Structure formats: C-alpha cells, structure tokens
Amino acid sequence: MSLCRYLDEQGQPQYALYRPGAICPLKNLTDEPPADGQIFSFDAARLASLQPTDEAQWISEPSHLLPVVGQPGKVICIGLNYRDHAIETGAEIPSEPVVFSKFNTTLVGHGDSIRLPAVSSEVDYEAELVVVIGKKAKHVSAAAAMDHVFGFTCGHDVSARDWQKGRPGGQWLLGKTFDTFAPTGPCIVTSSEVSDPSNLRVRMRLNGEVVQDSTTAQLIFDIPSLIEHLTKIVTLLPGDLIFTGTPPGVGAARNPPVFLQPGDECEVEIEGVGTLVNRCIADQ
C-alpha cells in the first residue's frame, strides 16, 4: 500500500492512497479516517481494508504533496553509509554508524521547492532511502527490527558543503538543516510491499541526467543494524524518520564540483518506492 499526505479543500492535512498521478482520500473509504499523525495506529489488516470500490473515488494528484510525516519526533540521518560513497570521498569505512540529525523545518513534500540559502554557494544533492518507524522501539535486536518499520519513502538529504565541512570545527548539523533541506515523498510504501529493502536501486537525476546510481546492497550498516544501534541510545517512536545514507556521485566529489542552482530539478527515484521531484529556487 502507498500512502501520501495532502491538504484537503479546507486546508487540513489528510491521508490518501497514492498512485502516480492520482490519490484516493482515506476519508472517502472510511467513516473514521486517521487524524494527522495517527496512521501508525492502523494495523496491517485495517490498512488492507481501505480499498476503493469505484475508480471515481480517485482524484487527480495535487501539484504539491505534504511531507509523508508532518511532525516527526526525530529526523535521524546516517552519513557515509554506502561503501562506494565512502570510497569516493576518500573516507575510511566507518566502524559504527555516523549519526546526525535535521530539524523538522527541513521537511517539505513532493513538488515543493528547495530553497537555496544566500549564505551558501555549495548546496549538494543526496538521494536516500528513508525508513518510517511505525512502532515504539528501544533496545531492539536486529532480528526484530523490521517489526518496528511502518514503511519506506524517498528522501533528499540536501547539504550545504561549505557549512558542513568548511566552518570551524565542522558544522554537520547546520550544513544539513537549512529550511527545506529534507524533501520526502511522494508516499510511504508500507513495509509489506517492499520485499527486500537491502537490494533497492537508488538514483538521483539532476535536470534529467542520472548523477547517482547504486543499490542499497552497498549499505555498510543495513536497516536492521541501524535500528539495533540507534535503539541502544534513543527510543524510536511512530513517525520517526531514518535517512539511511547516500550513494556515490554527489556534486562535491565531481571534478569540477557540481552544486545546485536556482531552476535545477532534482528527482530521487527508488525502486519499488517512487520518485520524489523538487525544484530549486533562490531563498528570499
């Protein structure tokens, strides 16, 4: 099942079934649709019961969708988690996950703009598979980790390299957390629909050209290992997001470097999950 968030006619966030080009609002399928943020309380059987009976229940996909989770408690990101990306950067293969975070103000949805800040001239792209947590998790083993995953979405870990690496002491948080620097979407694909998240093709297109192309088989720390590691430290809650890392081909590693410019269009495509599209504009 693929689920998205959108604004209804009254300007209220709602959930809908998603397919490219169309959505089916859940409020058309049940008298008790989940309130915003409450989709994670629906078990698999209840979700499976939400099936349209008439093609007329589908409506045209809005030009902009909301972030797949409105106000996650945590937006956790993993750095240098693809072997081929670590090699490209000249970094040592990490012995444990490199963890950082983003603020909620980074979150935008499919079709929204990425605002390029005036204080950075080195804004880079990073296509990522994002895990959406569905059940509270603390001290969870890798063997049980996937029981706590609601689903997956496409993410874009936009990064200001001149802040991330060029400021005194390095400023990973600031370089990663400018407003609009975490597009997600267009939808959450529930975990039951993704048979093998450890072998999904991940691509980034910049203005139609493929600039990143790898698979999650290159992950140094797979999703169960990440959840096991993180839950030794923090409690993961429904709606928390985990950006799992990016493949090689980032702009900073190119010769000459390639950084995002106003008018650029970024497409994150993940096999079996979807395609997230955002255009860059200058921040005002």
Model-derived segments and spans:
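Catalytic-pocket segment enriched in acidic/His residues
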Residues: 5, 58-60, 85, 91, ...
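N-terminal non-catalytic cap/leader segment that marks the start of a structured domain
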Residues: 1-97, 267
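Residue-level "contact hotspot" at macromolecular interaction interfaces
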Residues: 68, 122-124, 235, 259-260
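A generic local secondary-structure boundary/capping motif
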Residues: 4, 65-67, 88-90, 114-123, ...
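RNA pseudouridine synthases
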Residues: 130-136, 140-155, 161
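Structural signature of FAD isoalloxazine-binding scaffolds in flavoprotein oxidoreductases
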Residues: 93-110, 125, 261-272
